[in-house]
UniProtKB/Swiss-Prot annotation:
This is Tektin-4. PANTHER family: TEKTIN, TEKTIN-4. Signal peptide: none annotated. Keywords: Cell projection, Cilium, Cilium biogenesis/degradation, Coiled coil, Cytoplasm, Cytoskeleton, Flagellum, Ubl conjugation. It comes from the Eukaryota.
């Protein structure tokens, strides 16, 4: 069976032949004993300057042998050098390709981290802007609470100018005191929340700056690695840097590098989430405080309305009684005048009767008799005196009643003035001033 042919892809290496394996020819040293020998002459012991023919052959053969050995060694060296060149070339190409691939993988990792950092920076920037907007809302809400506080304190001060007996601690004053206390508590809460917002904004900016520095380093490294990945053997920008092939003492390991990036992003995300939670808390605080203030404002307004209604009812009743009292005073004055006239009317008959009795008392002697006329005149005088005493007593009672009515009138008029003043303070001063109370949007910091 025929032997399968072998396809040669390169020239086979020459077989080396050791020097000791070459055929060696033995030569005998020729003695110069010929006819032309110089043996025995004066030159005995001295070699001639010419080589012998055998020496010439031996020398030539040695040269051939040395040339063959040198060519054989050179051929082997050329073959080994060619193999070494091919192997080192392939190794260099594989190493360069692997390095390029590793640099490419590093570029992908760097791009991934750079994108994550860019995303986190953008989110932190947006979150910081939103937090600053919330801080502005808090400041507006805090400024808006100054108006309700001034209104409540002004209402309390105005109601201090009420007169007795209306200067009472009524439910309106209780609600106003609740309102002032609520506003002070809300102001303290808003101030503390503003401080928390300021601290959170500072932390957001610090972590954003840290991410930006890391991102800037990533961009610089990405550009460096991108440039390195584009270098080829034909690039003109490459040159020798003998001392570059060493690790820097301050160089990080892949593990510490990844941990640093992960921790940096994790801290930034934690602060961003804390900022988001704080913003939600601020929304709840502003909504609750605005609703609480408006509810308390409505409670105070309702108390004012009820109190004004009470004052109106009391004022109307006082005015009704005053009208009745004035009417009664007029009637009583007419009655007093009638009594005085009646007393005056009784004076003339009394004078007549007394004059008659007086004249009849001058009757002489036995004519001074207690006759029927005398008894009738006496009874008339007694009846007139009794009538006058009754009329005068009634006049005194009427005058006392009139004085009582006058006192009642004065008291009613005073109470009406006090109620009118209280109603003016509550309705015209306080309730009109409360119309300037901020809206829910203003208290929530939107305006």
């Amino acid at each position: 069976m025929a032997q399968t042919g072998v396809l040669l892809t390169k020239e086979p290496a020459p077989q080396s032949i050791d020097v000791c394996e070459l055929p060696r020819k033995e030569y005998e040293v020729a003695c110069n004993t010929g006819a032309y020998t110089s043996s025995g002459l004066a030159t005995a012991g001295f070699r001639t300057a010419k080589y012998l023919r055998d020496e010439w052959f031996q020398n030539s053969y040695a040269r051939y042998h040395q040339a063959f050995a040198d060519r054989d060694y050179s051929e082997r060296q050329r073959h080994e050098s060619g193999q070494l060149v091919a192997e080192t070339g392939a190794l260099a190409q594989r190493t360069q390709l692997d390095s390029t691939r590793k640099v490419g993988e590093r570029l992908e990792d760097m791009h991934c981290w750079k994108s994550e950092l860019q995303r986190e920076i953008d989110e932190l920037s947006s979150e910081t802007d939103l937090m600053m907007a919330q801080k502005l809302r808090l400041q507006r809400a805090l400024d808006a609470t100054s108006v309700p506080y001034s209104i409540a304190t002004d209402n309390l001060q105005c109601r201090e100018r009420r007169q007795h007996p209306d200067l009472v601690r009524d439910y309106v004053e209780v609600e106003l005191l609740k309102e002032t206390e609520l506003i002070r508590n809300i102001q303290e809460l808003l101030k503390r929340t503003i401080g928390q917002a300021v601290d959170q904004i500072r932390l957001n900016r610090e972590h954003k700056e840290s991410c930006e520095m890391n991102w800037s380093d990533k961009v610089e490294v990405y550009n460096i690695d991108d440039t390195c990945s584009r270098y080829t053997n034909e690039s003109t920008q490459v040159q020798f840097y003998p001392h570059s092939s060493k690790f820097e003492e301050s160089a990080s390991t892949p593990e510490t590098w990844a941990k640093f990036n992960h921790d940096n992003l994790l801290r930034a995300e934690r602060e961003r989430l804390a900022s988001v939670n704080l913003r939600k808390l601020i929304d709840c605080i502003l909504r609750d405080t605005a609703e609480d203030l408006r509810l308390q404002c409505d409670a105070v307004n309702s108390a004012f309305s009820s109190r004004c209604q009470e004052l109106d009812d009391s004022l109307q009743k006082l005015q009704y009684h005053l009208r009745k009292t004035l009417t009664e005073i007029t009637d009583q004055e007419h009655q007093i005048a009638a009594l005085k006239q009646a007393i005056k009317d009784k004076e003339a008959p009394l004078r007549v009767a007394q004059t008659r009795l007086y004249q009849r008392s001058h009757r002489p002697n036995v004519e001074l008799c207690r006759d029927n006329a005398q008894f009738r005149l006496l009874s008339e005088v007694e009846e007139l005196n009794m009538s006058l005493r009754a009329l005068k007593e009634k006049l005194q009672d009427a005058e006392q009643a009139l004085r009582n009515l006058e006192d009642s009138r004065m008291s009613l008029e005073k109470d009406i003035a006090v109620k009118t003043n209280s109603l003016f303070i509550d309705r015209q001063k306080c309730m009109t001033h409360r119309n300037r109370y901020p809206s829910v949007l203003q208290l929530a910091g939107y305006q």
